[in-house]
């Protein structure tokens, strides 16, 4: 809850801080006052530094009043968050020239954004939903409750079917090769040579349809694997890439 502010203040344990641990909490308050806020003079911080004292909560309550904290001692999380915010403001004020010259780290963010353009899309935007539905209908893609899933399916289909390379390969595949019916045994005889040839043609066409069906099944498996391989997919909750 407080990790970012604690990290900004260079606290020694920003990820493991537990404000519910009384000793850790008191030590943290002392550190915050000594190193960052410095509201009291050094000689006036003795009561706060006396961590084992049974009167410490009373002194802490007075400290909150002195720094004009709007929260009470009982509201510990809110108090910690407010004091951290105060400390961050003081930290910036003490080092204004240092932070003024800092350049924003935009290059890394741009690389991350370009790595997956779907990350920053608002899937609840009506225009986004309408656009995805229009594309899905145009490409005859099955509808899904999650519009991001539909968009990923569209992306996969476009990459595999509609890129210049994919179109070129598809055109080459359609050219085909001449087939000699004599090399394909029918397995039965109708008693009519013309009917035998027709049966052979139908069988070859059926085999071609089965191959196309298998190709589509393989593509569907690849598409599903691409979705479930998303590190943001939560299989337990049935949520994909959120």
Swiss-Prot record:
Q: Which InterPro entries match?
A: RTRAF
A biological process from GO: negative regulation of protein kinase activity
> What are the GO MF terms of this UniProt record?
RNA binding; RNA polymerase II complex binding
State the UniProt keywords alphabetically. Answer: Cytoplasm, Cytoskeleton, Nucleus, RNA-binding, Transcription, Transcription regulation
Q: Does the keyword Protein biosynthesis apply?
A: no
What Pfam families is this protein classified in? RLL
Primary location class? nucleus
The protein's location, in the record's own words, is: Nucleus; Cytoplasm, Cytosol; Cytoplasm, Perinuclear region; Cytoplasm, Cytoskeleton, Microtubule organizing center, Centrosome
Instruction: Locate the coiled-coil region(s) and give their ranges.
Output: none
Q: Name one GO cellular component term.
A: nucleus
What the protein does comes down to: RNA-binding protein involved in modulation of mRNA transcription by Polymerase II. Component of the tRNA-splicing ligase complex.
Query: Into which family does the record put it?
Result: Belongs to the RTRAF family.
Report quaternary structure and partners: Homodimer. Component of a tRNA-splicing ligase complex.
- Any idea what this protein is called? RNA transcription, translation and transport factor protein
Give the source species: Danio rerio
Gene field: rtraf
């Amino acid at each position: 809850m407080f990790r970012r502010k604690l990290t900004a203040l260079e606290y020694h344990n920003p990820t493991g801080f537990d404000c519910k641990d009384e000793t850790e909490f008191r030590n943290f308050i002392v550190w915050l006052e000594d190193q960052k806020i410095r509201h009291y003079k050094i000689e006036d911080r003795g009561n706060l530094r006396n961590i084992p004292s049974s009167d410490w909560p009373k002194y802490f309550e007075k400290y909150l009043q002195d720094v004009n904290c709007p929260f009470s001692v009982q509201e510990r999380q809110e108090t910690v968050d407010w004091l951290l915010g105060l400390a961050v403001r003081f930290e910036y004020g003490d080092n204004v020239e240092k932070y003024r010259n800092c350049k924003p780290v935009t290059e890394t963010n741009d690389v991350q954004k370009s790595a997956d353009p779907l990350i920053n899309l608002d899937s609840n935007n009506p225009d986004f939903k309408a656009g995805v539905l229009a594309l899905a209908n145009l490409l005859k893609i099955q509808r899904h409750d999650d519009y991001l899933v539909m968009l990923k399916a569209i992306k996969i289909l476009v990459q595999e079917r509609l890129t210049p390379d994919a179109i070129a390969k598809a055109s080459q595949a359609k050219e085909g090769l001449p087939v000699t019916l004599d090399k394909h045994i029918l397995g039965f005889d109708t008693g009519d040579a013309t009917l035998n040839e027709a049966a052979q043609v139908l069988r070859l066409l059926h085999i071609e349809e089965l191959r196309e069906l298998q190709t589509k099944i393989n593509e569907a498996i690849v598409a599903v694997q691409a979705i479930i391989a998303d590190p943001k997919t939560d299989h337990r909750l049935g949520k994909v890439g959120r």
